[in-house]
Amino acid sequence: MELQPQFNEFLANIRPTDTQKEDWKSGARTLRERLKNFEPLKEIVVSTFLQGSIRRSTAIRPLGDKRPDVDIVVVTNLDHTRMSPTDAMDLFIPFLEKYYPGKWETQGRSFGITLSYVELDLVITAIPESGAEKSHLEQLYKSESVLTVNSLEEQTDWRLNKSWTPNTGWLSESNSAQVEDAPASEWKAHPLVLPDREKNEWGRTHPLAQIRWTAEKNRLCNGHYINLVRAVKWWRQQNSEDLPKYPKGYPLEHLIGNALDNGTTSMAQGLVQLMDTFLSRWAAIYNQKSKPWLSDHGVAEHDVMARLTAEDFCSFYEGIASAAEIARNALASEEPQESAQLWRQLFGSKFPLPGPQGGDRNGGFTTPSKPAEPQKTGRFA
């Protein structure tokens, strides 16, 4: 069964909490204001914006005392052809020492900042273009479309367009609804560059393109795409002992988007469809004990699976095969309790059981006195 009410409750149980959302917004706003007012960097910083799973609404609730991870991009006007990656990043050390003493560390392509309530990942980038083209891009990066700290789920009308403004109520609804994504010619061919200390080179990155692709895919899937990503991430976390460490994060998200058809009608249907498509699409690759090459939505020459080993991909493929069998049975079941128990084999106790009026089994079924633990059968049981 589709059990959409139970899926809705499950999703509410695994989304970041309202407090966590406010924490990362506060952290992002505070950092933005501090950068804006830090005199040595005033002429360098163009804007800062949220990226990553937080911005794309594909993050799941951290377990235990783990803090949310928040990616913040700093867009600068630095000339990457005249400055080394190390020198570019070193410009920000006085800022970090002033506002985050003892709380920051240098990473390969970013700075990590550990606060009591959130983990910030500060990514320094530069606009590689020059002249009028650079000016147009700076306008985009200074626009509400980029600066918003709301996630895609919170701002469903969002478009990548410097003319977009947040929909704050019924008065602005008609105006925001008329704004569509800007033509690809205005943004797609213009990724940012970011410094890599370890390789001592500048590489291309296009977080806005990833955000825009996610927003469009979610609309085409009736709002189910970002929730399906969350569900698969939760399944992976619940079954981590039976799965390889990778893929996770964005590569996992990309694999889901690659397999999910447009027009998704429900969570249950979407899960079965994307797993079945994943298995059929990569069967030959799996049989060859290899892994796929998947182009990044923002920088076409980047393989999203570059750091994933063939061994891990094949192990993950086997995990999806086992999970798909359970998901098919859960969707096919016509008994609410049985269906829910099967979904719980994948997602654990965060997936609720239907209430007493949720449907009865034939043969004397009685409502359990407490939530049942999943039966341990098969790879993920």
Curated annotation (Swiss-Prot):
Primed for activation by Cap2 which conjugates it to cellular proteins; activation is target protein-specific (green fluorescent protein does not activate the enzyme), but which protein(s) activate it is unclear. Changing A381E: Reduced CdnD-GFP fusion cleavage by Cap3. It holds the Pfam family SMODS. Induction: Part of a CBASS operon consisting of cap4-cdnD-cap2-cap3. Mg(2+) C binds at D196. Its cofactor is Mg(2+). One of its GO terms (biological process) is defense response to virus. Belongs to the CD-NTase family. D02 subfamily. The record marks Q51 as: Important for GTP discrimination. Has an N-terminal catalytic domain and a C-terminal helical domain. Binds 3 Mg(2+) ions per subunit; 1 is probably structural, the other 2 are probably catalytic. Keywords: Antiviral defense, ATP-binding, GTP-binding, Isopeptide bond, Magnesium, Metal-binding, Nucleotide metabolism, Nucleotide-binding, Nucleotidyltransferase, Transferase. This is Cyclic AMP-AMP-GMP synthase. Mg(2+) A binds at D69, D71, D121. ATP donor binds at S53, R56, D69, D71, Q210, K233, Y250, V304. It comes from Enterobacter hormaechei subsp. hoffmannii (strain UCI 50). Changing G378E: CdnD-GFP fusion cleaved by Cap3.
